[in-house]
């Protein structure tokens, strides 16, 4: 059974930075992403929806820039789930907010674990656009993930989600 790929691969007019698709987001966080249609699914919804199925795969055939955005989202969800294990909703919210905003490596920098799969930004301006898009992406993903992980109880995270925190998608971590 193959891994699930992004449904946004067929979009042709999506801007890219490096070779990451800067897909529209349904978000209230500031950043360079275009606003998505509220009635449609965006890449954040897709990352959350496909996470549990895709996290079991060690190999993932990249078919386009939207798949690279999906991979980044899947790896970020894994990191988030590792951080919220055992925390109540308020503490998890603070933890994930600081995780989303902390300094992180982008493709092309020495600390980025997926440099073999991602192209570096072409210029310093492109690097800044990539960093701000990924920051906006991380903030929105962390915010929406909390509503899934704490859907039933606010005292502790759902075991249905945290059981996936030890799984390594593609044997990688951010």
UniProtKB/Swiss-Prot annotation:
Pfam assignment, any one: P21-Arc
Subcellular location as annotated: Cytoplasm, Cytoskeleton, Actin patch
GO cellular component, one term: nucleus
Keywords: Actin-binding, Cytoplasm, Cytoskeleton
Record GO terms (molecular function): actin filament binding
InterPro entries: ARPC3, ARPC3_sf
One GO process term, biological-process aspect: actin filament branching
Highest rank taxon of the organism: Eukaryota
Assembly: Component of the Arp2/3 complex composed of arp2, act2, arc1/p41-ARC, arc2/p34-ARC, arc3/p21-ARC, arc4/p20-ARC and arc5/p16-ARC.
Protein family per UniProt: Belongs to the ARPC3 family.
Function (record text): Functions as a component of the Arp2/3 complex which is involved in regulation of actin polymerization and together with an activating nucleation-promoting factor (NPF) mediates the formation of branched actin networks.
Name used for this protein in its record: Actin-related protein 2/3 complex subunit 3
């Amino acid at each position: 059974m193959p891994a699930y790929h992004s449904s946004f691969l067929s979009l042709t007019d999506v801007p890219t930075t490096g070779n990451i698709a800067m897909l529209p987001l349904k978000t209230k966080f500031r950043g360079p992403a275009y606003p998505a249609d509220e009635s449609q699914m965006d890449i954040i919804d897709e990352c959350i929806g496909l996470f549990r199925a895709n996290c079991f795969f060690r190999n993932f055939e990249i078919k386009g820039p939207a798949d690279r955005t999906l991979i980044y989202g899947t790896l970020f969800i894994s990191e988030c789930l590792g951080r919220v294990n055992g925390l109540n909703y308020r503490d998890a919210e603070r933890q994930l907010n600081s995780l989303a905003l902390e300094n992180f490596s982008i493709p092309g920098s020495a600390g980025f674990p997926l440099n073999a799969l991602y192209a570096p930004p072409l210029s310093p301006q492109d690097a800044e656009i990539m960093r701000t898009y990924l920051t906006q992406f991380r903030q929105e993903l962390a915010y929406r993930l909390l509503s899934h992980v704490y859907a039933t109880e606010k005292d502790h995270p759902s075991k249905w989600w945290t059981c996936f925190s030890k799984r390594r998608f593609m044997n990688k971590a951010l």
